[in-house]
């Protein structure tokens, strides 16, 4: 667990012991700031408190719980709710040769399996092996808690409870692994592989096909506007389009 700000906490979990350096995020631009955190331990419970947020880690089950300073629970992980299943992805690619436009030297390039580009010599096949994990984390939300987000989904629903959504980019379907709760917090799941969001009476989970670790950010703003501001602080501020462009857009293909 790491406090990036007094109300933004990063949670990472791996199967490795000791300090593990994860890859630099492609989406998160915020760097950790100097945050005063009070840490205490009672038996298997470790509590870390900033000026705005309290986080409790159960060393026995690995469960993380987020609360505000008056003790009201915001979000709780499910007991033993983390899964990291080792996987190995194998891809065969063909190296082809093409003349450089700069100096005329021959340089190797890569193409997808079965791709046949005219004018290029067929090269040798090469195998790429990547060891990774299928990663999953489950949470417990209040029964009547409403959450928004997860991108542009064609379900006709605003509240994303009681749904199973596959988060991948498709025409008219934009996936964003982030949801915001009416309780004033947001959760950003930092993973770029195909991810399944699943909410049932048994729990709420993100499951990604590939990842080196469980990696997510908890943001507590207290209300929707403040939480969106924290997300912009975390991932960068996208400029608004000019006022004259707002209105009805139509693209006919």
What are these language model-derived features?
Residues 2-46, 84-87:
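A low-complexity, Ser/Thr/Gly/Pro-enriched, surface-exposed linker/loop concept
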Residues 41-253:
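Catalytic and substrate-binding clefts that recognize carbohydrates or anionic sugar/phosphate headgroups
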